[in-house]
């Protein structure tokens, strides 16, 4: 628990002063509130004794001043508390988001995307509420409890002892509730992750859901996930609901005893030396003790709920990236040569088999390499090792003659532009999306990159041209247009190595040929690695690599492979005669 608190406390930073100021302001507020019943008791006794109007005015003025002070300090405490808790939550979100940005793909794979979203939103909101209660309510309630009990003891000692018996009973009950509810809330948050998984998957694949008329199935699937959350949350809340009635019973029982026994002693003068003013103040202090205990109950409830959230947040903040830049990292890539020296790779140490086995491949700077293989042959896995999105399990990968582990990650990835299988565009203008490749790109540079990617032609047809708004995920452009924009974005990086991971699959063959022709003419010194299903997309490459089940099955020119490689021959024949591809090999890349 201490490590969790220390980790979260780092996010307080500039809000440390307001976090400390809030309890101080609350202390003044509580002192005034506890002093008011004492003054009222004296005023009642003075009035019983037949005091003058001057005395009443003097006491009334004192009460008004104390009430105003309490109001001012209470309002100030509320403002500083809101500022500190909101600032703490903002810093925590930033710290988590920045940490996630440093994660490797392996780290991301460890947490599901929906789980990370839940931790960034719901979990942080829970911790924010708990923090707000801790710096204000959790300070106010114990102070109110102690001061009210002390004042009550001063005014009616033996009568105030009643609360010494009720408070331990309440604490025992509270501990039992905490022990029972904590594991249930842990289960609730796991179910929240599953619910978010369902929502995210459905929203992202809405077009597929509708095209297959699967709305009813998705509704049932979501309803089941929501029901699981409801069921476990209800169980947890049933236990937490015992907290309030238990508190009320104990404290109201104490108040009834105070009222009954106190009134009896006032009437019969049984030696408690308790007068009417003191009796009225004792009732006020009893009420303050009641409210303090009730609020403490709420604080503990919130802390119980937020404890699991805090642990989940700390899991993210404590996760160390599996890929980091070394000390004294190289900040310059000499050229675009790539060497795979007997590389083997698997995504998880627990995996039984390698995704890639004994890959020995040497690519010269400026060379064009085509990669073909069936789905499941690990084509994408191979190219992800070049910008060090994953680390090899065995062997080494070199770029510019240097092991990728020796480079600064930002330097390496700036020189290796990858257009991934799944093309992603962000909400914003076409210019905004293109500038992901180069934030300082000029309009002329963007237009040139789009001409090379054969995107300028369709962009010019839009009314707003390069200022056309792209919806989230590029939902308002076609698959082929999206691919060409992503290629243009990569070209703006002016990389030494350009990797196209099946990035023209949605483009017609004529446009694909134009893109390849433009690359030959304008990018002669750039190393190009092209993954494709169509042989026509790679047949002009200097060499073509055929992958099968994560191993090199053949390598050579188009003509050499046609003469010597059985897989290449079969696919070439099927594509020229009937449009076949490598998918018959099975699996997923």
Each PLM stretch: what is its role?
Residues 332-589:
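ABC-type nucleotide-binding domain
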Residues 1, 24-25, 32-45, 66-113, ...:
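Juxtamembrane helix-loop junctions of ABC transporter transmembrane domains
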Residues 49, 86, 94-118, 122-124, ...:
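Short intracellular "coupling" helices and adjacent cytoplasmic loop segments at the cytosolic face
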Residues 13-17, 102-106, 122-135, 139, ...:
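An intracellular "coupling" helix at the cytosolic face of ABC transporter transmembrane type-1 domains
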Residues 14, 18-31, 72, 132-188, ...:
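Transmembrane helices of ABC transporter permease
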Residues 1-33, 40, 48-63, 77-81, ...:
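Membrane-integrated ABC transporters
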Residues 51-58, 65, 151-165, 235-312, ...:
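Helix-loop-helix
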């Amino acid at each position: 628990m201490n490590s969790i608190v220390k980790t979260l406390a780092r996010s307080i930073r500039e809000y440390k002063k307001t976090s400390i100021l809030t309890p101080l302001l609350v202390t003044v507020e509580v002192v005034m509130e506890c002093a008011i019943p004492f003054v009222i008791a004296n005023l009642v006794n003075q009035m019983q004794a037949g005091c003058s109007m001057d005395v009443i005015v003097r006491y009334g003025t004192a009460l008004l001043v104390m009430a105003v002070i309490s109001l001012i300090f209470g309002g100030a405490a509320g403002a500083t508390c809101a500022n500190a808790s909101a600032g703490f939550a903002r810093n925590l979100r930033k710290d988590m988001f920045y940490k996630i940005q440093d994660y490797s793909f392996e780290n991301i794979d460890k947490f599901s995307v929906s789980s990370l979203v839940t931790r960034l939103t719901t979990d942080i909101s829970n911790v924010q509420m708990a923090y707000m209660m801790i710096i204000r309510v959790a300070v106010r309630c114990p102070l109110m409890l102690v001061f009210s009990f002390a004042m009550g003891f001063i005014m009616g000692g033996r009568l105030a002892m009643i609360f010494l018996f009720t408070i331990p009973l309440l604490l025992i009950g509270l501990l039992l509730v905490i022990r029972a509810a904590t594991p249930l809330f842990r289960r609730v948050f796991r179910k929240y992750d599953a619910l978010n998984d369902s929502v995210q998957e459905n929203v992202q694949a809405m077009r597929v859901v509708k095209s297959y008329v699967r709305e009813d199935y998705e509704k049932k699937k979501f309803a089941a996930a929501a029901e699981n959350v409801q069921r476990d949350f209800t169980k947890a809340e049933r236990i937490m609901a015992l907290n309030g009635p238990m508190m009320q019973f104990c404290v109201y029982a104490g108040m009834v005893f105070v009222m009954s026994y106190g009134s009896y002693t006032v009437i019969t003068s049984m030696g408690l030396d308790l007068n009417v003013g003191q009796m009225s103040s004792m009732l006020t202090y009893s009420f303050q003790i009641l409210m303090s205990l009730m609020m403490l109950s709420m604080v503990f409830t919130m802390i119980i709920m937020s404890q699991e959230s805090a642990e989940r947040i700390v899991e993210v903040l404590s996760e160390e990236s599996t890929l980091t830049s070394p000390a004294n990292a190289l900040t310059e890539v000499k050229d675009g040569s790539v060497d795979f020296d007997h590389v083997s790779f698997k995504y998880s140490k627990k995996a039984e088999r390698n995704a890639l086995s004994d890959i020995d491949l040497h690519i010269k700077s400026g060379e064009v390499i085509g990669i073909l293989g069936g789905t499941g042959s690990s084509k994408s896995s191979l190219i992800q090792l070049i910008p060090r999105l994953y680390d090899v399990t065995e062997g080494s990968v070199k770029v510019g003659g240097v092991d990728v582990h020796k480079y600064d990650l930002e330097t390496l990835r700036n020189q290796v532009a990858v257009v991934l299988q799944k093309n992603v565009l962000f909400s914003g203008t076409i210019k905004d999306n293109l500038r992901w490749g180069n934030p300082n790109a000029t309009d002329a540079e963007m237009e040139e990159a789009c001409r090379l990617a054969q995107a300028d032609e369709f962009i010019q047809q839009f009314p707003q041209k390069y200022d056309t708004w792209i919806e989230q995920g590029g939902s308002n452009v076609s698959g082929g247009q999206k691919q060409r924009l992503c290629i243009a974005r990569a070209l703006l990086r002016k990389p030494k190595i350009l990797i196209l991971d099946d990035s023209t699959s949605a483009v017609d063959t004529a446009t694909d040929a134009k893109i390849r022709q433009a690359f030959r003419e304008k990018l002669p010194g750039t190393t190009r690695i092209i993954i494709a299903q169509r042989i026509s997309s790679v047949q002009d490459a200097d060499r073509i690599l055929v992958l099968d089940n994560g191993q090199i099955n053949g390598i050579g020119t188009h003509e050499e492979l046609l003469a010597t490689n059985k897989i290449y021959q079969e696919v070439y024949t099927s594509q020229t005669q009937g449009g076949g591809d490598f998918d018959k090999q099975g699996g997923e890349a």
